[in-house]
Amino acid sequence: MSSRENPDTSAPMAQQQPQQQQQQQQPQPQQQQQQQQQQQQAQQTTQQQQSPQQPSQQSPLPAAAAAASVIAPVPLPQNGSNGAALGVTENLVCQWQGCQERLPTAEALYEHVCERHVGRKSTNNLNLTCGWANCRTTTVKRDHITSHIRVHVPLKPHKCDFCGKAFKRPQDLKKHVKTHADDSVLVRSPEPGPGTRPPNGMFGVGVGADGKCSLGHVHGQGYPHGAPQYYQTPHQQHPSNPSYGNVYYAIGSDSHQASYESKKRGYDALNEFFGDLKRRQFDPTSYAVVGQRLLNLHGLPLPLVNGAAVAVPEYQTQPMPAMVSVGHGGGHSGGGGYQPASPMQSYHLPPMGNLRTKADLMNIDQFLEQMQSTVYESDDHVAAAGVAQPGAHYVQHGGMSYRTSHSSNNANANANASHTATSSPPSAATNIPSTHATATTTTTSAPMIPTSSAARLLPTHAPRHALTPPSSAQSYTSGRSPVSVSSTHHHIPPSHHYTHTHNHNHNHPNSSAGMYPTLPATSAQDGSSTNTYHGVSGAAAPSTLSSVFDSEGGRRYAGGCCRGLDRGLWRRHHRRRQGSPSMSFAEVGGNDTKTASPSMSFSASVIDPALQAGSEKQSGSSGSGGEAGAGAGAGAGAGEERNGSSSSPTADVEEVSRALSSANATTTMATKTAPPEVPSHTVEQWVANVRLLEKLRLYIYERLSR
């Protein structure tokens, strides 16, 4: 019986053991390689305990029994905290190839990998390839691989100040901080103390004792004084918003902002203009193109001070808008309100990109010089623009007049004196200054304009503001400069010039003849030519300095003077004019001929005495019939010979007649080709262009000098 019961009892025991094994294996987690040593020790102790209890039992299933004995002593996880602790413990094992060393902390594990596996170049064991598990990442520097090892090690020393999240590498923290960009109004900054400027951010919040940003209420303690009375707000009975502390925002003056934007706009326009000059994007010899390009700079606040006397440095500081604080009812700062804050750091205008080097400045200065020569000295372009009138030296501009040629400032004559009758007082004729349109003692090559048109062109009042071209004050060698022009034109007889200059300076002691000598117009040496313009049509002849000023009055010149004039007669005439300044001369005006007595007429002094006596016998009064303003002395003598009876003609009379016909032809041509009256806006634009070019050149000069 016993032999039968034993197999029956052993069968249920063998069936219970696999069932227990399955029940215990279900909650059992997967075994790790790190626990092999503990499992072996537990297996040995279990076998020693089971061997005395079942000495007679044969083990038909030794593998199952061994497995059951091994599983029995392993403790099962009770809760999630134990599992987390187990995971942290497992992560502190070095998984470098060939190393299974366990470290107590993450810092120790990181130091272990860096020192033992990465090594150093100084110890000749530097390894730049990551051997953690199957990573195989290779770097070029030790710093790079040590930063890479932080990815494998659970060491997170970098914490976010906003949310407290920790990161392994500093670059990971920077990426995370960018996710808080939506919360940029909450910039962590300390509360401003007395005398300190507001934080860099537009808004400020408090900082807690633990170093993290505190979004709670922050008392206003930045400024010891209360808010201004006119901004004072009543005491709030209800608590303020606890989400923010003191808020800082800009309420800068709009005038400063507008001033900066205006200066910035002018600065950019000037920089663009200089860039066009460097790239030669327009023709500097075209008056229309230059005027159109300069028109873009008019009206803009260019960086020039007091007419470009001093150039403004490109790093010009401008005040920033002030920052103010708005308190939220702290009670310590005297209640809420607007608090004045100290100004922030100044900002500057950007540097000009087209004026970086000295070569740029010199090239632009040369280009501006070409433009200046075009505006000043191109007769054809200026005449086409309606600024220059043939034979006229002044252009009326509102209440002011500008001199457009190189002539003397003594030319501000009263044009109404041209219409003075012979019955006027003798002193009226002597006070008429010389101009190229009305002077009767200066031979001119400019087209003769009738007195009516001269009266319209010449101003009768207002002071003259000279716009002296650079060619008369500086060493410019342009094609229209006085040096080049005077060398290509003929010279005027100094006999006429000397006489007129002496009387003119005598009557006008306050004239500027010291700086500007009397500038006669150029004349053709041959008086018989019918066209005194050579290659210039419809444009103002340039008034230039004469290269020869001969003070000797005894020399004889051809053209306009009788050949029979001797040295003694000239000296007697000169002394007689000095003794009687009230001597009158022939007036020429329009188509009317004013006559003067032969004894008082200036024409009588330049005619041979024999011819003058014959003329007095034939006619009671003589007058000049010519309409010319210059060379009227010779014209008057020819008129006397024409109006009188037929006397024996001489060679001198024939020469005078030819000169008179030449002057009449020139006057007719000038009358036909005279342009209409100059529009005021054209003159204003020309003057603005002249002044702008002068300012720009002075600005470049200041930059070059620095």
UniProtKB/Swiss-Prot annotation:
Keywords: Activator, DNA-binding, Metal-binding, Nucleus, Repeat, Repressor, Transcription, Transcription regulation, Zinc, Zinc-finger. SUPFAM superfamilies: beta-beta-alpha zinc fingers. One of its GO terms (biological process) is positive regulation of transcription by RNA polymerase II. Residues 1-65, 397-434, 463-543, 573-679 are annotated as: Disordered. Residues 488-507 have a biased composition (Basic residues). Residues 14-65, 404-434, 659-674 have a biased composition (Low complexity). Residues 1-13, 469-480, 520-534, 592-604 have a biased composition (Polar residues). GO terms for molecular function: DNA binding; zinc ion binding. GO terms for cellular component: nucleus. It is found in: Nucleus. A zinc finger (C2H2-type) spans 92-117, 128-152, 158-180. Coiled coil: none annotated. Belongs to the pacC/RIM101 family. Transcription factor that mediates regulation of both acid- and alkaline-expressed genes in response to ambient pH. At alkaline ambient pH, activates transcription of alkaline-expressed genes (including pacC itself) and represses transcription of acid-expressed genes. This is pH-response transcription factor pacC/RIM101. It comes from Paracoccidioides brasiliensis.
